[in-house]
């Protein structure tokens, strides 16, 4: 279901953990999706710009909610913010390899209405 949402026209992706550090996947994923024409919005509480584009400190700052939240953050951060993001009404969640945990997987399985991908790289899926 998340892959289908990704293929819809005008889908907005919030990249939680976007980074200016070219060595980090938060930067690689952001640049990759942007180069492929995806509407990707960088989320990072410590940055004002990511690759010259306005970065938001949180999803709530965005002008409208994204269709997909893509996580490229450590597992404790993903677990901490996922319930809140779900409560906002974002139901398509994508967890990059390394952002998941057993606790998160259990929460996702026990939460109705959430469509999610774990251990699947968005750069690979969009080739």
Located regions from the model:
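Hydrophobic, well-ordered beta-alpha structural blocks that scaffold small-molecule cofactor pockets
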Residues: 1-44, 51
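A short helix->loop->beta-strand "cap" motif at the edges of active sites that frequently abuts
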Residues: 38, 88-92, 111-114
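Short, charged, surface-exposed secondary-structure boundary motifs
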Residues: 50-53, 67, 103-106, 125-127
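Active-site regions of enzymes building and remodeling cell-envelope glycoconjugates
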Residues: 52-60, 114
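Mid-chain, well-packed structural core segment of small domains
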Residues: 59, 63-99
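Rossmann-fold NAD(P)-binding glycine/threonine-rich loop
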Residues: 97-125
């Amino acid at each position: 279901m998340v892959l289908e949402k990704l293929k819809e026209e005008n889908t907005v992706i919030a990249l939680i953990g976007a980074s200016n550090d070219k060595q980090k996947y938060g930067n690689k994923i952001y640049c990759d999706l942007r180069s492929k024409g995806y509407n990707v919005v960088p989320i990072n509480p410590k940055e004002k710009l990511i690759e010259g584009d306005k970065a938001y400190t949180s999803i709530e700052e965005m002008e409208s909610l994204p269709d997909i939240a893509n996580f490229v953050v450590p597992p404790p951060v993903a677990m901490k913010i996922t319930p809140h993001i779900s409560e906002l009404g974002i139901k398509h969640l994508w967890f990059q390899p390394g952002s998941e945990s057993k606790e998160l997987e259990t929460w996702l399985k026990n939460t109705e209405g959430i469509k999610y991908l774990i251990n699947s790289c968005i750069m690979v899926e969009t080739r």
